[in-house]
Amino acid sequence: QKMDADFRNMFGRWVKEQKKIGNKIFLVTGSDKKKTIQQIGIPLWRFVDGCYQNCGNQLYHKGRLIKQSSWRMSAELRLLIVTIMEKSLWYGVADTNINERVGMVNISTIGRGCTAEQRKSYCDWDKQSLERESIARIIRAVHPELDAAIGGQISIDVYPKGKDKAQVLDDMEGETIFFGDTCEIGGNDYPIAKKTDFYYNVSSPEETQRLLETNSR
C-alpha cells in the first residue's frame, strides 16, 4: 500500500534529524525495488542510507545496486507451491499468486492483484484459519533447506535458510533498533527482531509515527 503523504513527510524529516546526530537509517523490506518506490517514492528511497529489498537479498544505496543474491526458485518448489495454492478457497480471486524476486519468492493464495477490500477480507479470514501458517509449515517440511515466513497481510516469503531479513545485521555497526509489523514467531520480521538490540512490533502507521516522535531510544 502507498505511504500516506503526511507520514512520508514526517518520516523524511525524522530521517534528516537522525542523520544530523550521526545515526544511519536503513529500510528492510520483503518487496522489490519497483514496489518499494511505488509505496514510498523515489526521493525517500534514495534519501535513506540504504534500502534492503527482498528480505535483505538485494541492497541499494542512493539508487545504486550494491549487491544481490543469485538464488532462484526450482521447478520442484514451484510445483509444490502451485499444488498447495490450488486447494485454497481463495485461489483464483486475483492474479500474481507467485512473484519471483531476487533471492526469494513471494506467494499469495488470493493473489497480490486483489483489491483493498479483498485484501482485508482475506487477512481477517487468515487470522482465524491460519492458512498462511499452514502453507509455510508444509514448505519448510518438504524443503528443509528453505525457510517460509508470513509477510504483510496476504503473502508468504520463501528463501534459503539464513537469507532472511536478519542478514542485514552483518552490515550494521553499533546499536541497532528495528521497527516491523510481523515480529512474532513465523513472521518475516521475526529473524531480525530477535537478533537486533531492540525492536518495536508496530500495528499501524499512526503507532509508528508516535514511537518515532516520542521515543528517545
Feature roles, as predicted:
Residues 7-97:
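Active-site phosphate-binding/coordination module
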Residues 157-217:
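Mg2+-dependent phosphoryl-transfer enzymes with acidic/Ser/Thr/Gly-rich catalytic loops
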Residues 1-6, 27, 169, 189:
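Asp-based phosphoryl-transfer active-site loop
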Residues 92-177, 183-185:
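Conserved acidic, metal-coordinating active-site core of Asp-based
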Residues 18, 40-43, 84-88, 139-143, ...:
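Alpha-helix C-terminal capping segments
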Residues 2-3, 36-39, 63, 117, ...:
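Short glycine-/acidic-enriched loop or helix-start segments at secondary-structure transitions
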Residues 52-55, 152, 203:
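Residues at the C-termini of beta-strands that transition into short coil/loop
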Residues 20-25, 144-150, 196-197:
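A generic structural motif
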